[in-house]
């Protein structure tokens, strides 16, 4: 998608470049579906029909009913809606169990609930970056109203077995709500909603624009759902505000575009990840933070020499674009690496490279070349 051969974008976990065909769908929708979908006249009816079609298309990729799919502005909004909108509907207990490396949009709503008297149990990841599902299950009891666990970690790429987690949670307490943040997983790994009650996805991680996402909310929870904010009856009254129809159509186009190619894209991206791992293996200082079973789209490592911000600035000057941690935690050290027990030097020198299927071996080679130059040059300056 990039036309500049000297520019190498390797930060796809932060955001992806909008696909040209998705941009075309949005542009067309802005011109043709300008009416409010709630309006009763003919243009409004056509907009409503288009919105329903977009909803159905996105729902198909998740394997849910159209009426269980709600458009949001992003994954963060979806997480807030899911957590704050369901927790207070459960009156049989105050227990909440959550993994220790969730996105801030999961952490902070749960911190608010903790301040309101809920008992939040945080299960830290293991030293290798994996999550012990059994430890989460051990924390579930008759008073547990909610369990939250991301499917793929946004910083190190850990893939969590949320299907097993959800099934086992329901066996222990069928009334417990299971929430899954699938923002980094959607269109990267297969998704099954069995035993999962709420799930969030986001458009800008799959080559749709920023500003559009979706929340899956099991139909059995709708009647008791308490939306955090109130307004009109859009999205069945659960997410008020005039719908962003052009972006909803763009989300549907992006999801449909990728839905049939998960396996082939996984193979292509895995080859890039392997190439990068092999290239990094020649640096004795480098320590890989991503666990062996991580999704291939994300490779996090610490170079244990140069502060991340310094190395990122060097690479950016060479048009190599990567990151040090989650874009949503800008300027903050990685809470994921801290939860894993990494030492301060490893945290301060961490770099995240994240791929999409549009990346090439040349992107990897360019990164490795500029990274090697940076290690030599910046260490000389440091001395």
Q: Could you tell me what each predicted segment is?
A:
Residues 1-383:
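Pyridoxal 5′-phosphate
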């Amino acid at each position: 998608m990039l036309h500049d051969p000297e520019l190498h974008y390797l930060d796809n976990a932060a955001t992806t470049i909008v696909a040209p065909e998705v941009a075309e769908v949005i542009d067309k929708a802005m011109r043709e579906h300008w009416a409010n979908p709630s309006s009763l006249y003919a243009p409004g009816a056509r907009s409503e029909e288009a919105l329903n079609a977009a909803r159905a298309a996105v729902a198909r990729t998740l394997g849910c009913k159209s009426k269980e799919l709600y458009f949001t502005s992003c994954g963060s909004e979806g997480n807030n809606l899911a957590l704050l909108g369901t927790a207070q509907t459960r009156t049989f207990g105050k227990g909440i169990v959550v993994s220790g490396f969730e996105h801030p949009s999961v952490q902070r709503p749960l911190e608010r609930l903790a301040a309101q008297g809920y008992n939040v149990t945080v299960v830290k990841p293991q030293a290798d970056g994996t999550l012990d599902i059994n430890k989460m299950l051990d924390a579930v009891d008759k008073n547990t109203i909610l369990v939250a666990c991301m499917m793929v970690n946004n910083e190190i790429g850990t893939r969590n077995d949320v299907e097993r987690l959800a099934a086992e949670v329901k066996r222990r307490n069928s009334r417990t709500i299971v929430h899954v943040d699938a923002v980094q997983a959607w269109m990267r790994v297969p998704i099954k909603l069995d035993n999962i009650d709420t799930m969030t996805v986001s458009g800008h991680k799959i080559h749709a624009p920023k500003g559009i996402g979706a929340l899956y909310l099991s139909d059995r929870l709708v009647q008791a759902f308490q939306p955090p904010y109130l307004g009109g009856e859009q999205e069945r009254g659960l997410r008020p505000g005039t719908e962003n129809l052009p972006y909803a159509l763009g989300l549907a186009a992006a999801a449909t575009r990728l839905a049939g190619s998960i396996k082939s894209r996984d193979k292509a991206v895995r080859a890039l990840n392997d190439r990068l791992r092999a290239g990094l293996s020649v640096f004795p200082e480098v320590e890989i933070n991503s666990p062996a079973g991580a999704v291939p789209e994300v490779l996090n490592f610490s170079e244990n020499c140069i502060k991340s911000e310094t190395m990122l600035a060097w690479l950016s000057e060479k048009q190599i674009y990567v990151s040090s941690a989650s874009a949503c935690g800008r300027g903050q050290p990685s809470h994921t690496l801290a939860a894993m027990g990494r030492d301060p030097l490893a945290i301060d020198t961490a770099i995240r490279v994240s791929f999409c299927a549009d990346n090439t071996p040349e992107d990897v080679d360019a990164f490795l070349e500029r990274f090697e130059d940076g290690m030599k040059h910046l260490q000389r300056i440091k001395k």
